[in-house]
């Protein structure tokens, strides 16, 4: 025997109908986030698949102008956005390697970090909705179920022994259907949240790896001096001035 949803809707009380409406809104909102997020990440991945090999090749060939041009033209891909932020920060210095200092390298690293934070914030926008829907929809449905069962047994008490099981069956069905709706809303939201979270973690690895590749290129392009820590360089400079290994206070 099938379930007549229209009949159940007609038999529902105002509270149960309100619960169903709330869950319908939650479902529409979460599906909208899923579609928007899927399109956003797919476009970003496609753009990065085109950009990353070209950029890596340009870096390996030390074709700086081409690398900068690629980063500036690709604004959709997550990797291009991160590298574009770093290159935009130090582009005038990159064209003249003799002027690059450790402060410039640090500036490029900070630019990468800032752009990664912005990009990740955009990627994660909406995930909170999926997490909230996935966590609360079953409880919203359970609330409707609880109130439906209360109403069913209240009706049974009013009818007395003459009502029997038939007297409360409609109320029980009304109560349980809200739990089913809650699970139908929550399960896709939880699946989507886990999927997008994993996908964003993978994109973060791609951004981190490629940005490190750029920073390594900048360090190598100005010599091995930047392979040493700032403290080591300051210590050696002080040692050269004082002629000893101790730094005076």
Regions found by a protein language model. Give the residues of each.
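Hydrophobic membrane-targeting segments
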Residues: 1-55
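Alpha-helical membrane-interface segments at transmembrane helix boundaries
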Residues: 6-16, 113-134, 166-177
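Hydrophobic side chains within alpha-helical segments
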Residues: 20, 33, 40, 127-129, ...
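Alpha-helical transmembrane segments
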Residues: 24-44, 48, 142, 149, ...
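Predominantly long cytosolic amphipathic alpha-helical stalk/bundle segments
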Residues: 46-140, 147, 151-162, 191-249
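Conserved functional loop/turn residues at catalytic and ligand-binding sites
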Residues: 63, 141, 176, 180
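Hydrophobic alpha-helical transmembrane segments of polytopic membrane proteins
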Residues: 175-189
């Amino acid at each position: 025997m099938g379930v007549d949803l229209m009949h159940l809707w007609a038999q529902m009380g105002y509270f149960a109908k309100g619960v169903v409406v709330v869950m319908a809104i939650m479902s529409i909102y979460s599906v909208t986030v899923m579609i928007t997020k899927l399109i956003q990440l797919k476009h970003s991945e496609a753009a990065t698949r085109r950009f990353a090999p070209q950029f890596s090749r340009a870096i390996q060939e030390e074709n700086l102008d081409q690398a900068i041009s690629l980063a500036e033209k690709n604004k959709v891909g997550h990797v291009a956005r991160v590298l574009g932020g770093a290159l935009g920060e130090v582009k005038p210095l990159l064209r003249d390697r003799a002027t690059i200092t450790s402060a410039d390298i640090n500036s490029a690293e900070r630019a990468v970090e800032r752009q990664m934070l912005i990009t990740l914030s955009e990627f994660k926008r909406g995930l909170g909705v999926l997490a909230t829907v996935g966590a609360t929809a079953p409880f919203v449905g359970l609330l409707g179920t609880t109130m439906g069962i209360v109403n069913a047994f209240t009706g049974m008490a009013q009818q007395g022994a003459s009502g029997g099981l038939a007297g409360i069956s409609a109320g029980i069905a009304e109560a349980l259907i809200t739990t089913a709706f809650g699970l139908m809303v929550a399960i896709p939201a939880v699946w989507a949240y886990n999927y997008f979270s994993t996908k964003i973690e993978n994109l973060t690895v791609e951004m981190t790896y490629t940005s490190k590749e750029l920073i390594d290129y900048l360090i190598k392009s100005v010599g091995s001096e930047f392979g040493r820590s700032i403290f080591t360089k300051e210590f050696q400079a002080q040692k050269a001035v004082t002629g000893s290994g101790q730094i005076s206070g």
